From Swiss-Prot:
Note in the entry: A single active site specifically recognizes both ATP and CTP and is responsible for their addition.
Gene: cca
Name this polypeptide is given: Multifunctional CCA protein
A Gene Ontology BP annotation from the UniProt entry: tRNA 3'-terminal CCA addition
Organism of derivation: Pseudomonas fluorescens (strain ATCC BAA-477 / NRRL B-23932 / Pf-5)
Taxonomic placement: Bacteria, Pseudomonadati, Pseudomonadota, Gammaproteobacteria, Pseudomonadales
Gene3D superfamilies: Beta Polymerase, domain 2, cca-adding enzyme, domain 2
Amino acid sequence: MRIYKVGGAVRDRLLGRPVTDIDWVVVGASAEEMLAKGFRPVGADFPVFLHPKSGEEYALARTERKSGRGYSGFTFHASPEVTLEEDLIRRDLTINAMAEDEQGRLTDPYNGQKDLEERLLRHVSPAFAEDPLRVLRVARFAARYAGLGFRVAPETLELMRELSESGELQALTAERSWKEISRALMEDQPQVFIQVLRDCGALAVLMPEIDALFGVPQPAVHHPEIDTGAHTLSVLLQAALHQQPLSVRWACLLHDLGKGLTPEEEWPRHIGHERTGLELIKAVNERFKAPRECQELALLVGQYHTHGHKALELKASTLLELLQSFDVFRRPQRFEEFIAACEMDARGRLGLESRPYPQADYLRGAAEAARKVAVQPLLEQGFKGPQLGEALRLERLKAIKAYKEQHAP
């Protein structure tokens, strides 16, 4: 029995990055031997065991053979005769196909170290094209390591393009796709994930609503970058630079989908894109079964982001309607995330990344003014039921009007 540290732990140590999760592969052992040593089986599809003390995952060396469509269409074979090299060749990228023994000696049969030095994301073997999920994984790694100068090797991008055209991407489950998408959006440069998917044709298959934004112009006076797709990528980058949560990043990605439906004769204006984009946002949300908080925020940001930008011009009644749409008195955090998404949208414009966004504090102030209205005096005046709700609305409206007068430009 020989035990090796494999994959990301080896890669990140060589890159000088923090190592969080460690995966181990066991060569020359059977499942019975692992059980005899106190390891606990957890793998449903192939032999994976938890270490009796550390709880880390140990997998028996295995080979795999394509036997059906999609991510799960594989037959696995694990036995003591499977070599380390045979186990490593089934992995996606050369930089993930290195192993270290217990003395720290490196095994690198597919030149992963060379590709690390050359900053290349390169597939290990032609079998890469058998697993459509790898298109998303490579794009995610590109987003993670873009800051270190990594790029996808041309021949790997070509394989990804073939996979995108094969129909295999449609076999991916919503859950597997969302897991990769959500992880990619939380990387330091999530816009690279979208760009790589576009470069290989996968974006047009998985998220055609976003792909359709590229080449659609916006008014240069508001958007010096002009292209709606380029703007979306910039907004996503700003969300990452400002360390926004997943829900905000997802909303930033989807906020302008309606612009892809604007007839060409109306370009570069996009009147009503907030409303026309809602069905598209719903479709993308449902396609990937995004978490409820991500779905809700994406729809609200899509519908109301222009309100956010025009906050200082809105009537008091419109401001109150906006606050009520977000259920701000019970869910203040969601309104904060809306403000954040609006600010990222404003900053995602060429040359305007550092421009102040006074709308943010103005919206917070309006919400706070309305929140300070007390219910108890209205109860003491005898209001109840629907009359109480209307009286409370009028008092909040009065408070917002006073706030507007105090903060008039």
